[in-house]
């Protein structure tokens, strides 16, 4: 299965190609996407993205995980979370969300098994 491209991004709004739902924050993986609801894991801007936010995507067999930290990069990504992803044998890339979407789409367009989590506001 291929990773779906992100069709559009604006403040507080993301669309994934082939999906009728729009998201504020989202998770994408080969063959699917869904809302990234921070309440599920108790995530906040600080300390930031937790391994539990990423487990679902890592189970999908991605080779690369792209993390979008928000338009102003307010969402933190602790070193322990990066270490967790790397220990799973997955390359991890962290960017401001607009740049993260560009990188994710470039990898998806090449047919790579890429996943991502994207914060579309601050």
UniProtKB/Swiss-Prot annotation:
GO terms for cellular component: cytoplasm. InterPro entries: AAMDC, MTH938-like_sf, NDUFAF3/AAMDC. The gene is aamdc. Keywords: Cytoplasm. It is found in: Cytoplasm. This is Mth938 domain-containing protein. GO terms for biological process: positive regulation of fat cell differentiation. It comes from the Eukaryota. Residues 6-122 are annotated as: MTH138-like domain.
């Amino acid at each position: 299965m291929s990773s779906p491209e992100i069709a559009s991004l604006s403040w507080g709004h993301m669309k994934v190609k082939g999906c009728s739902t729009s998201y504020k924050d989202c998770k994408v993986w080969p063959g699917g996407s869904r809302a990234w609801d921070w309440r599920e894991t108790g995530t906040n801007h600080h300390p930031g993205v937790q391994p539990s936010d990423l487990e679902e995507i890592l189970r999908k067999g991605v080779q690369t995980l792209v993390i979008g930290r928000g338009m102003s990069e307010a969402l933190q990504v602790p070193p322990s979370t990066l270490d967790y992803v790397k220990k799973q044998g997955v390359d991890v890339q962290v960017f401001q969300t607009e740049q993260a979407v560009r990188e994710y789409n470039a990898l998806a367009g090449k047919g790579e098994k890429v996943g991502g989590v994207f914060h579309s506001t601050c």
